[in-house]
Amino acid sequence: MFQNKVAYITGGTKGIGFGIAKILSDQGIRVAISGRKQEDVEKAAAEISSDASKVLGIVSNVRNFEAEEKAVSEIKNHFGQLDYVVANAGMGVFKPVDELSVDEWNDMIETNLTGLFYTLKASVEELKKSEGYFISISSLAGTNFFEKGSGYNASKFGAVGFTQAAMIDLRKYNIKVSTIMPGSVSTNFNGNEPSGKDSWKIQPEDLGNLVLDIFKMNPRSLPSKIEIRPSKPNN
């Protein structure tokens, strides 16, 4: 089913993005991952596969549209096509709104929302050719607001709205668009250090398997918005 398919995962050097890339690669999908640091990109790519014909590491920042255009061009030159895009890159700062700086606000909006647009804008023509799939990784914070989350909530509410509107726009090209909204995930996000204490949380590979299941669905069906949370709360 996945023979010769190619996926691009932004923020793919660790956490959710790496978990998704590893699962897709294990299923025979050729993967390109991006990150902001060369050493992180190289290390993650080597962990995904030692075969350069199956994995491509790219240094890119989703806040830079030209960098995302270049990333897609590299993918096409290396693999010849692009079938799946998983827009995963994201960040968060959690402070009361009166303490949140302008720079912190802009960092979140430019990464979590504008970066999402840049990634889709840079890849959409290739997805038209392949009649491919675009998935954004948003958050339950895109529908549930909370204390100290004003900037993060705004960016993730926006990400959900953007992705759902894009889904309607792109259906006529046979491009499928979904957004995944995870709850607590065991990653390094917000200074967390994954350990045994995180065993109750969603694991990155769980999201990789979810993405894989979405790609396996009959093409007549489109799971446009998916909430996923730990099955049991942390006690």
Question: Residue locations for each model-derived region?
Answer:
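Residue(s) in the substrate-gating loop at a strand-loop-helix junction
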Residues: S139
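Active-site helix of classical SDR
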Residues: L120, S155
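Conserved glycine-rich cofactor-binding loop
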Residues: T13-G15
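Conserved glycine-rich Rossmann-like NAD(P)H-binding loop of the short-chain dehydrogenase/reductase
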Residues: Q27-A44
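The beta1-alpha1 cofactor-binding region of Rossmann-like NAD(H)/NADP(H)-dependent oxidoreductases
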Residues: V59-A71, V102
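Substrate-binding pocket helix/loop in short-chain dehydrogenase/reductase
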Residues: P96-V97, E104-N106
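C-terminal helical subdomain
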Residues: T179-I180, G196-N235
